[in-house]
């Protein structure tokens, strides 16, 4: 389908960040927040060339006067008009390409509603007139990027986490576990527990400040109860953060209480399993012969796995769950924040992948439902 000289575009639309770039590159060209901001107030200065909507970094920088909305929630697109704006911004402003000249690879969370992919396909072909496209599962691409063909991927982003077992390149769909608990829930939880300290964060713009605090200062405790004791007895764990207006706030046990939710979702009232239990459940749903290979190839990917201490804690929790003789290895590649994108870049530049694309002709013949037949 695609000629060898046309570079494919790889777009990893996360709930929190959009990563986009060209196939064959080793890192995404453009990484910007998946947000659309609309002005809260009427513009009164003539000639200011005000827009009705801002996307990505521009929305982030003007966040004080905007209402920020994320069109993707828990990995599912909830607002297609805003999603179209984000894609338009990706192609024309960030990558500066004409989408009608390049095949496009998109990514998706597993166990998503089928209508979500169909709509994605429809917009790509009908609004952006792409010559070809493909949709792949995020975790599968992360495994590509880690150079393995077998492993259990724990992919946790801003909107959704999932564990996917892959054996010799085949994903085992019956064993996928999806957890609607990820970075955004942690940010919301942090907003809540900072209120206990007397710091109130309420607006959509302030939520972004809390996200920044979360990304810079939090870590995962190896032993949560022990860490709580330490924090209560001394102020050694306290760190300060300077807000945009110059005020300095001090945070203590919030630093490790926030990401603890990943292991104990009951802290935010979610009746779900922690990420370690999800990984264990996934492996237990697989054939008994391949479990050993999965236990020693647990690959972390996505921005919510960037917390310091996550690998050690994961190893400890899984060792407690798994049979005592089992060797457990948790792999946390340094580039895991972008490993989905990197995997997409690798996959779409493989010569064997070229016949996998859904072409415009196939779409015209079968309509959006072709995506279920051709994509995993």
From Swiss-Prot:
Belongs to the actin family. The keyword Hydrolase applies. The lineage of its organism: Eukaryota, Sar, Stramenopiles, Oomycota, Peronosporales. The keyword Ion transport does not apply. GO terms for molecular function: ATP binding; hydrolase activity. Actins are highly conserved proteins that are involved in various types of cell motility and are ubiquitously expressed in all eukaryotic cells. This is Actin-1. SMART domains: ACTIN. The gene is ACTA. Keywords: ATP-binding, Cytoplasm, Cytoskeleton, Hydrolase, Nucleotide-binding. It holds the Pfam family Actin. It catalyses: ATP + H2O = ADP + phosphate + H(+). It is found in: Cytoplasm, Cytoskeleton. ACTA and ACTB are actively transcribed in mycelium, sporangia and germinating cysts but only at a low level in the case of ACTB. Its main location: cytoplasm. Its EC number is 3.6.4.-. InterPro entries: Actin, Actin/actin-like_CS, Actin_CS, ATPase_NBD. GO terms for cellular component: cytoplasm; cytoskeleton.
């Amino acid at each position: 389908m695609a000629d060898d000289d046309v570079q494919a575009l790889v777009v990893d639309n996360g709930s929190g960040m959009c990563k986009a770039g060209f196939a064959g590159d080793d890192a995404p060209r453009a990484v910007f927040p998946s947000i659309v901001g609309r002005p809260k107030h009427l513009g009164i200065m003539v000639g200011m060339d005000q827009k009705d909507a801002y996307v990505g970094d521009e929305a982030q920088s003007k966040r004080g006067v905007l209402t920020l909305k994320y069109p993707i929630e828990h990995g599912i697109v909830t607002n297609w008009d805003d999603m179209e704006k984000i894609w338009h911004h990706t192609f024309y402003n960030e990558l500066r390409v004409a989408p009608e000249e390049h095949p496009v690879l998109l990514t998706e969370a597993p166990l998503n509603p089928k209508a979500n992919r169909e709509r994605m396909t429809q917009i790509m072909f009908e609004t952006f007139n792409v010559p070809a496209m493909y949709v792949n599962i995020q975790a599968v691409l992360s495994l590509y990027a880690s150079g393995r063909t077998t492993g259990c991927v724990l992919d946790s982003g801003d909107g959704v986490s999932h564990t996917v077992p892959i054996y010799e390149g085949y994903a085992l769909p019956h064993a996928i576990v999806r957890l609607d608990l990820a970075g955004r829930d942690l940010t919301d939880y942090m907003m809540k527990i900072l209120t206990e300290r007397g710091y109130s964060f309420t607006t959509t713009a302030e939520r972004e400040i809390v996200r920044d605090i979360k990304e810079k200062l939090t870590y995962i405790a190896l032993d949560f109860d022990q860490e709580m004791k330490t924090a209560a007895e001394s102020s050694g764990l306290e760190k300060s953060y300077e807000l945009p207006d110059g005020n300095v706030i001090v945070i203590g046990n919030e630093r490790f209480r926030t990401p603890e939710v990943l292991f104990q979702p009951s802290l935010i009232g979610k009746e779900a399993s922690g990420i370690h239990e999800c990984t264990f459940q996934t492996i237990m749903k697989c054939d008994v012969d391949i479990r050993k290979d999965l236990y020693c190839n647990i690959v972390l990917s996505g921005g919510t796995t960037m917390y310091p201490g996550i690998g050690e804690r994961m190893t400890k929790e899984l060792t407690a769950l798994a049979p005592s003789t089992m060797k457990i290895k948790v792999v946390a590649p340094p580039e895991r924040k972008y490993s989905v994108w990197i995997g997409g870049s690798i996959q779409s530049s493989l010569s064997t992948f070229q016949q996998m694309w859904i072409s415009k002709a196939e779409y015209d013949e079968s309509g959006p439902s072709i995506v279920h037949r051709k994509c995993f």
